[in-house]
Regions:
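Short, surface-exposed basic-aromatic patches at helix termini and helix-loop junctions that form
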Residues: 141-143, 179-183
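Short amphipathic alpha-helical segments and helix-helix/interface helices
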Residues: 23, 153-156, 175
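A generic structural motif
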Residues: 148-151, 165-168, 182-196
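Internal amphipathic alpha-helical segments of the cytochrome P450 catalytic fold
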Residues: 137, 171-172, 184-185
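Phosphate-handling DNA/RNA-contact segment within nucleic-acid enzymes
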Residues: 50-161
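Alpha-helix N-cap/helix-start capping motif
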Residues: 19-20, 134, 168
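Acidic beta-strand-to-loop metal/phosphate-binding motif
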Residues: 160-178
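TOPRIM metal-binding catalytic domain and adjacent DNA-binding surface shared by DnaG-type primases
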Residues: 1-69, 193-196
Length: 196
């Protein structure tokens, strides 16, 4: 029996041929496809529609009646026989011109809680960049992570900080997820400087 994720991945791979919208997206956002491929698998532009569940989660599906969306794979890692192996844990989609309208294939409780799981599992104390959207993450060559859905606080606790957030709102969200342990972690916001 094929799982929902396997079925949707098959659909994604069938639609993954570059189209004019894909080329425009890659070019306009200066995405290095070779650099991001190991971290997000396939990048496609496909017609999708999303629905909001009663608990506020957003799910998407491929639909000929949908709107053009960017779709990527959420890669996680599992340990098997002493080896760390990547696998696709979920699919993530957003309208091509609205990167903050995020939806996943599997929703809360299933799939992957964040993009950039390997970054969150780092062993040094370099700051973990927490990006506000998958697009912002892709533009950096997938440096850091993106919080996708509930359960991400476990990853944040494992990462241990310091964290660099894009803005004050995101920093507050990270602190909220860290709870009473937030003071033990540095949650930073880069200071923007005006060019002279």
């Amino acid at each position: 029996m094929t799982s929902k994720l396997d079925w949707m991945r098959q659909q994604l791979y069938q639609m993954a041929e570059p189209c004019p919208e894909w080329w425009d997206f890659i070019k306009q956002n200066k995405i290095d496809v070779g650099a991001v491929d190991p971290h997000c698998g396939t990048i496609a532009v496909a017609l999708c529609k999303s629905v909001e569940t009663i608990d506020g989660d957003r799910l998407f599906e491929f639909s000929p009646n949908g709107i053009p969306c960017v779709v990527i794979e959420a890669i996680c890692f599992r340990s098997e026989n002493g080896n760390i192996n990547p696998y696709t844990a979920d699919l993530v989609a957003w309208p091509i011109h609205s990167p903050d309208e995020l939806a996943t294939a599997l929703g809360a409780g299933d799939g992957c809680e964040l993009l950039g799981a390997w970054s969150a599992c780092r062993t040094d104390q370099t700051p973990l960049k927490v990006h506000p959207t998958p697009l912002a993450w892709l533009k950096t060559g997938c440096d850091g992570c993106v919080m996708l859905k509930p359960g991400v606080e476990n990853w944040l606790h494992k990462a241990g900080g310091p964290f660099i957030c894009g803005d004050a709102e995101q920093a507050r969200e990270v602190c909220s997820m860290l709870g009473d342990q937030a003071p033990m972690h540095d949650v930073l916001i880069p200071q923007l400087r005006r060019a002279a």
